[in-house]
């Protein structure tokens, strides 16, 4: 879609000499949620004392199971795996860490086992916990020619376990690179011959390994498949389900409050009609992603409020403001002063005021916690984001296609991931100044995540953006550099 002409003043003025403002409007899909969460009854989200007492009793039983001695260490590994996949491991972090440390320190615990399933499960759980378990443990499953043995091909459970373990590989884990290729090939070839239940597990794993599923989605899914496992324990499942429902009530309460603020305080979509009406999407993807646990409720609310304003900023730069207006807006954000409001176009004033209000709220919260330094990092992250948005707007205005390197340098910022990482620490009381310094120092792990997020976003949005004459994507920059045409 090309740029649309929109009158810059009220339509009832019919002066033909009035200039017409061209805005890069986008046709965003409407929210599928509407006022669903706003209409939630607060009483329906209350948690009964009976439920809290029951979940505590079940928690104690699961804790006893976790700490009980076992003859076969694989039983303990399977219990830990179930607890993690069911989304309740946050209750037992200390216990799980102690158990896995003992297993890591004792190489006899499955280290000499010839059971592919158990060896792979042990490896994955230890790598997830941060232990640099050597990958050459899988050499025992190779033949003299360096290929994985024929004997394991029909071990579906073992192959699937090795497949999941291979996704914990790091640079230099050549055997895990081979394992990923081998297991993927085997699973794809056997899936059509498996019973429906196992086939469904395999297809889901091939679509996305455990490491890449959001914890809440994996927990909800595993409720239905866990009973089919040989290690199924009804107490563990009942505890996980009740805990899930209790936390879900908390999440519903949070998204209800954020939705109400989105509509009533920020005025979306009635007063600010050009932005994506996506507060529920923001909550689910941006906020539950970093942390779903109940102890981070305050952090989610703080992050949600900032993310809401940042989303409006994004669409203002991307789908409404002219370059001249955006320069004024960026200048106001850099200066961060109430006095700047008067220099802004009318439609920008409420967004800028909301930005000032939320940072004032953060200042008050951080002061109470003795962590006022968090305010500085919040402002700097948003300023950096605004400057990157403005550069994109400049490229669009000039129809400039940057080099891949030039594009990625700016696009990693506009993707918002590094901003999200920084802001997610606001509501975490144990996040020190050193933590914020680390997050803002462009660490490799954050840069890698930024790169993945940006490229994935560009892959799915390029066609839509090109239709509206939008700023180029990584794909456009690469195609120009490679002098190739769209297939």
Enumerate the language-model features and the residues they cover.
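Terpene synthase/cyclase
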Residues: 1-487
